[in-house]
């Protein structure tokens, strides 16, 4: 059972598992351009999915993955939330993180539904980490049961480094 703020929450759709092919998406970047999975073709991808960049745990998660994985060759960390692109950009500027890929599902929540992370009761995204290989195959998946807690950074980072 997944909880948010101590309460059970529900989702629509089926969570991706190791071996699944990731769904394409169309998300809004901080410059308001549209980004799809194809924009990151040929790269290893870490989808760091968070409820809101303006919370402590989400901020920590975003900072940690970007700090620890930004130097890996052929790897991109993609942070996804339903925050407005302006808020995502403001956070990056305040944190001094210049090369973070921040994408927003604010417009139609299609990413949240397709990846089964849209919290029905709150219309926020649940906390999850998905590692995709260069062919968009899921090689690591963690859907955090208590959304108010951090993911298993070490396991996710090891999964990327082992690709």
From Swiss-Prot:
Keywords, in A-Z order: Antioxidant, Disulfide bond, Oxidoreductase, Peroxidase, Redox-active center
Q: Which CDD domains match?
A: PRX_Atyp2cys
Can you give the residue ranges of the Thioredoxin domain? 16-162
Pfam families associated with the record: Redoxin
Query: Is Transport one of the keywords?
Result: no
Q: What is its EC number?
A: 1.11.1.24
Active site, per annotation: 58
- UniProt enzyme class: oxidoreductase
* GO MF annotation list: thioredoxin peroxidase activity
Report the domain of life of the source organism: Bacteria
Q: Which reaction does it catalyse?
A: a hydroperoxide + [thioredoxin]-dithiol = an alcohol + [thioredoxin]-disulfide + H2O
Which Cys residues form disulphide pairs? Answer: 58-92
Quaternary structure?
Homodimer.
Q: Give the function comment from the record.
A: Thiol-specific peroxidase that catalyzes the reduction of hydrogen peroxide and organic hydroperoxides to water and alcohols, respectively. Plays a role in cell protection against oxidative stress by detoxifying peroxides.
- What other note does the entry give for this protein? The active site is a conserved redox-active cysteine residue, the peroxidatic cysteine (C(P)), which makes the nucleophilic attack on the peroxide substrate. The peroxide oxidizes the C(P)-SH to cysteine sulfenic acid (C(P)-SOH), which then reacts with another cysteine residue, the resolving cysteine (C(R)), to form a disulfide bridge. The disulfide is subsequently reduced by an appropriate electron donor to complete the catalytic cycle. In this atypical 2-Cys peroxiredoxin, C(R) is present in the same subunit to form an intramolecular disulfide.
UniProt record similarity statement:
Belongs to the peroxiredoxin family. Tpx subfamily.
Q: What is this protein called?
A: Thiol peroxidase
Q: What is the lineage of its organism?
A: Bacteria, Bacillati, Bacillota, Bacilli, Lactobacillales
């Amino acid at each position: 059972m997944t909880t948010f703020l101590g309460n059970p929450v529900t989702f629509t759709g089926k969570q991706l598992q190791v071996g699944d092919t990731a769904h394409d998406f169309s998300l809004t970047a901080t410059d308001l351009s549209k980004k799809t999975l194809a924009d990151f073709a040929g790269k290893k991808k870490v989808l760091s999915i968070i409820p809101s960049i303006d919370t402590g745990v989400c901020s920590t998660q975003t900072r940690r993955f970007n700090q620890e994985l930004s130097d890996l060759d052929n790897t991109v960390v993609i942070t996804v939330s339903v925050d407005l692109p302006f808020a995502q950009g403001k956070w990056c500027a305040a944190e001094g993180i210049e090369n973070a890929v921040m994408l927003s599902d604010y417009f139609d929540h299609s990413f949240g539904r397709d990846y089964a992370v849209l919290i029905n009761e709150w219309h926020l995204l649940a906390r999850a980490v998905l590692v995709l290989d260069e062919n968009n195959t899921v090689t690591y998946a963690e859907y955090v049961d208590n959304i108010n807690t951090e993911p298993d950074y070490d396991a996710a980072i090891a999964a990327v480094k082992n690709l």
